[in-house]
Each structure stands twice: as C-alpha cells, then as structure tokens.
Amino acid sequence: MALLGPSGSGKSALSIELAQELDAEIFSLDSLSIYKEINIASAKPSLKERKNIKHYALDYLNIDEKNNASLFKTLLEDAMRISQKKILLIVGGSSFYLKSILEGLSDTPKLSNEEVVKIEREISALANPYAFLKSIDPNMAFKIHPNDTYRIHKALEIFYATHTPPSEYFKANPKKPFAHAISLFALSVDKNALHNHIKQRTKN
C-alpha cells in the first residue's frame, strides 16, 4: 500500500494516523529523508512518532552518498521481509522512484566508491555528454531527450562501468518487475495552500 503526495501535502501526518489505525509500519520513499543530515525540508517524523511506529529508509545515507531507485528497491524488499506487521505503508513524494520500482529495474553493475568517483570524473570531463552518448550508442540516445540529463548520466554510467553500449547492456539485463502488488493512493492539495504550507515549514 503506497501513499504519495508532494511536500507539504500532509501525507506524513496522515501516514502516522493510518499506521496507528491499521497497525502498520512505514517505509519512507523520500529522496531527502533517506539522508541523515537533511531534516527541515524532508519533514521527517519526530523521534516520538518513530518510537511508536517503526519506520524504514530514514537517516540511511550520508550526504555524500547517492540515492537511486535501485537502492530504494533493495531497502523496500528488505523491509517487506523483516517487517513484523501485515501492512507496510509506503509513504513519500518520490513517485518517480516508485514507478521505476513497479515497472521493473535492470540489475546494475556493483561499483566501489573509487570506481564511482572515477566514472563521475570521466562524465564531468565530457564537453557534450549527449553527443558522446549518441556517438557510442545511437539507439539509446534516440530514446532520450537531449535535455534529460538524469537519463543521459545514467546511460553513461553504464557505459563507463561495463564498456558496453547501454542499449546492449539492458538487452542482456532486462527489467525485473517488482514481485509484490502495491495499491496506490495519491493526495491532491490546492496549489496555494500547498505553497503556504511549505513556506511555513521552512520558517520553523
């Protein structure tokens, strides 16, 4: 069961109420709350709320570590395996990650921190990352908009890690759909009320 909504929509408070009513535990699918050092913008539950209701994927990464859909998938599978409750409530604003998890992810190369740094340095040195991607893998470049820097970067990470054109790598490593069915619920909030809520949060 997943509850999604933008920052300031009230999903965190609602998730606490639902978890209490349903006797559930909470998995935080949030690209900010997963970091130990980020607290204000992420609207993490209080220590008291966490004491009463078990939360997963909070304060997991240091600020210099990267999060991605593959990491959240691994953490979600771990949480489902060890949770003591019948219901695990997935809560967050990262609908992109949830969509990626549900549709399926390909296995990605396991890299050391040193290898990650080296690859990042090589990609940063490119004058035109999209043009380079087009030169090594026209098929993959055709599927990605030139302004989609995230997907371009991910494709180049695959290339530098495997020395294989990304389209060939994904053909050999097809997506694996998520093994569990998840019911989705989304919160809809008036835009002005949402902006006011976010302003108030950042003042505190």
Predicted regions and their residues:
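Phosphate/pyrophosphate-binding catalytic cores of soluble transferases and nucleic-acid-acting enzymes
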Residues: 1-204
